[in-house]
Amino acid sequence: MSGSEEEHLVSLTFRKNEEDMDEDEGKVKQKEKPKEKQMEFVNQNFVESTEDESEVSTPTAVGLPIGTSTPDGDETPTQPDPNGKYTMAQTKDADLSRPSGLPSNGNPGSSTTVPPASKSGPVAPPRPSGTPVAPQRNRRRKVTELKCSEVRWFFQEPKGTLWNPFNGRDSIMLEIKYRKEKGIELDEAMQEIYDESLTHYKMEMKDEPEIENGNIGMEQEKPMVVVMNGQYKVNKDNSKIDPIYWKDDSKEIRRGSWFSPDYQPLEMPLSDQIEKNHLQCFRNQMIPEGTTVFSKSETSNKPVLAELHVDGYDIRWSSVIDISLHQKGNAILRYLWAKSTPLRRGYEKEADWNDAAAEISHLILVVHGIGQKGYENLIAQNANQVRDGVVSAMEKVYPEEKSRPMFLPVEWRSALKLDNGLTDNITIPKMSSMRASLNSTAMDVMYYQSPLFRTEIVRGVVSQLNRTYKLFKANNPQFNGHVSVFGHSLGSVICYDVLTQYSPLMLFDKYVTKSIDEYLKRDDTNASEEARKALEAMKLAREQLRDNLEGGIHKLLVTKEEQLEFKVKYLFAVGSPLGVFLTMRGGESTDLLSKATNVERVFNIFHPYDPVAYRLEPFFAPEYRHIRPIKLFSNTDLRARASYENLPLDVYKHYLKKLKNLNKAKKNKDDKTADARSGGDDENEDEDECDSDEDARSGCSSPRSMTPPPFETAAANAAAAAKETKAVKKGWFSFGTSSNPKKTQSTASLGSVNATSTENIEFAKEAAEELPLAEKILGSGVRVPHRIDFQLQPALTEKSYWSVLKSHFAYWTNADLALFLANVLYCKPLKPEEAKPTWA
């Protein structure tokens, strides 16, 4: 072909052709339309310089001649101009999705043989089978502004590197807020959602002035959009989310419209510029299917239809969907490091309004105890740990349950002034670290015992409880579930006092009244007649005050600042010293669960090695000290998924042995032998706390075995457990001492071993009668209305000093406790015919 013919071919104008293809018959029809007015332009963003050939992509012809129609009926838009730059000829509905017909070397002056168009019109080459399929939303769509659902918002943890997507509803709410403030029109679907569900947020345009009292431009108060299950609120400039119920846990957020191949969002300024240029160049162009329009052989020779230079990056368009990001630099650096990164427009999955957090059916307020001074955010982490454990347990045990509980932290220590640092001033400087630790932990207990600081602590806790509840209700107005309190350590004591409206002044009032009565009864007093009459009048006035004042004198002592504004269903006292506090107050069973108690039920949950925890059931009857607390089954045990309400009473093993020895002593009339053989109760009590669950009573208290052992093998199991216990039990707290089980076994006589086996066999047979025996032990004394004490199971390795120290803080991540909480909150009451335990 001569140069004049080539020049004539290159200068041909594009003609608009419309093509209708019949897929069944394989026929193609073409119709010509009058040529519309063409507008040629040269855009710097569409220019590929030929000076540096290392930067120039040299696409080859892809089978379509210049000036012919694409399968969609649009002309190929790319042609070289006489100046050596690519020129875009726009026509109505021009399709820039795939460039074609470029010279093989990318040089407009080179000679290229271009095949003539067939009479039936050009046919697009078949798409490679390995080409990824684009999302459904990209099929047969034109390039327009992204819908709200195509944009996805992300958050990043403070020390994280990855961006995590919000759920569909949170992302839509953030995008609607963003567009309302920017004055960007919502698409039809999002406008409908806004009108139905989000009008109460009153999202205003950012630049809209407010006219009030003659002041123009006063910034309006932005609505508080809450995300992440209602625990975080969005700041005014949509750059981060701040926690609502605790402090110092802000997370950066980012609006994602353009993404890397792994769908990590680009920075918002860069994304906005790319989006603006993309719409300017490709608006109303058809979006083809797949993630690229080029085959594997063509990827190295992609043309550059448009280019954008932003902050050290080059963004290049090879088609509507083939966009790549390049780092700037010289040719060597680009060759070594700066490989192009494909970009994706719109998130891989559209946001769905129904993709929301589970409905909240129960609110649990988590109150910390001692040791929080200087660690204000620790309780927030602990509350999240408990919630994660409960949710994980519910996914396994209650997969059909759609709702979830919400655990919110209540941090009360940092807001208190107490002695204004006087304790720190009087602390001896020697061993300062240890003394500072004691001041931040043990001093909280002493503060609470002080009549001077106790009121400040109680009011501080009540204030934070009410504040958290009000915030939650404001952010979740549809919530109508129950509220419970999870109190740890000293926090459980404070919450119990708040719920029972206990005041130490009541105890003081009783003491004063008793002193007056004793004084008036004495005859040897030197008080005058007038003084005696004044005391009698005071006593009578106090009695009338109790009788006539609604609520009695108690109402005068307990102020409004010490009362909750909501009803509490459950109190979970975890690792609680409540028992010893009640003992120091002279408490009785009537005081433990009085009529004034503003709670439905109390659960006293403790670890057997926790030095701070105490039992509560012996308050009702001293005989309960012989009854075991309910042992929580392991979370891997099938029995842990059933209710604990129907478990029989379980008597301590050491007490059973003591009764058996006493009975033998009575038969043999040998009191000395009975005394000798009934000794060592402390050692047996330790055995009770960590005995093997494979004994005869495992049907009542076994926490680890999946199924209870048959009664026929219980005796053998008990004997084996006894041998193992004797070998391991020695040195429970003995460090640095040597223990030789083989030596111990060799020194034991065969007769003693046989006697031990016989005793365990007899003991296993007696275990079947534990329930009636427990009833006999309790007799006609006061009974608990429901079981209160619940004991966690220690791990096999938790027999050391360190285990004792850390057991008080091991509740937050305990899986057995998490499953128990889930059962209490969501387990449905059993019918009478189902009341029998499934493992019985």
Swiss-Prot record:
Which enzyme class?
A: hydrolase
Q: Where is the composition biased (Low complexity)?
A: 97-111
Q: Which reaction does it catalyse?
A: 1,2-dihexadecanoyl-sn-glycero-3-phospho-(1D-myo-inositol) + H2O = 2-hexadecanoyl-sn-glycero-3-phospho-(1D-myo-inositol) + hexadecanoate + H(+); a 1,2-diacyl-sn-glycero-3-phospho-L-serine + H2O = a 2-acyl-sn-glycero-3-phospho-L-serine + a fatty acid + H(+); 1-hexadecanoyl-2-(9Z-octadecenoyl)-sn-glycero-3-phospho-L-serine + H2O = 2-(9Z-octadecenoyl)-sn-glycero-3-phospho-L-serine + hexadecanoate + H(+); 1,2-di-(9Z-octadecenoyl)-sn-glycero-3-phosphocholine + H2O = (9Z-octadecenoyl)-sn-glycero-3-phosphocholine + (9Z)-octadecenoate + H(+)
Q: Which PROSITE patterns match?
A: DDHD
Here the segments flagged for biased composition (Basic and acidic residues) are: 26-39, 668-680
Please list the GO terms describing molecular function: calcium-independent phospholipase A2 activity; identical protein binding; metal ion binding; phosphatidic acid binding; phosphatidylinositol-4,5-bisphosphate binding; phosphatidylinositol-4-phosphate binding; phosphatidylserine binding; phospholipase A1 activity
Q: Where is the composition biased (Acidic residues)?
A: 681-694
Q: What does the entry report regarding how activity is regulated?
A: Inhibited by E-6-bromomethylene-3-1-naphthalenyl-2H-tetrahydropyran-2-one (BEL) in vitro.
Has UniProt tagged this entry with the keyword Secreted? no
Q: Has keyword Lipid metabolism?
A: yes
Domain DDHD positions: 564-827
Q: Which InterPro entries match?
A: AB_hydrolase_fold, DDHD_dom
Its EC number(s): 3.1.1.111, 3.1.1.4
- GO BP annotations listed: phosphatidylcholine catabolic process; phosphatidylinositol catabolic process; phosphatidylinositol metabolic process; regulation of asymmetric cell division; regulation of protein localization
Q: Which UniProt keywords apply?
A: Hydrolase, Lipid metabolism, Phospholipid metabolism
Job of this protein: Hydrolyzes the ester bond at the sn-1 position of glycerophospholipids and produces 2-acyl lysophospholipids, being phosphatidylinositol (PI) its major substrate. PI is a versatile lipid that not only serves as a structural component of cellular membranes, but also plays important roles in signal transduction through distinct phosphorylated derivatives of the inositol head group. Catalyzes the hydrolysis of phosphatidylcholine at sn-2 position in vitro. Regulates asymmetric division, an important property of stem cells in C.elegans, by controlling the subcellular localizations of beta-catenin.
Please report which protein family the annotation says this sequence is part of. Belongs to the PA-PLA1 family.
Q: Which PANTHER family match?
A: INTRACELLULAR PHOSPHOLIPASE A1, PA-PL1 PHOSPHOLIPASE FAMILY
Q: What is this protein called?
A: Intracellular phospholipase A1
Q: Which gene encodes it?
A: ipla-1
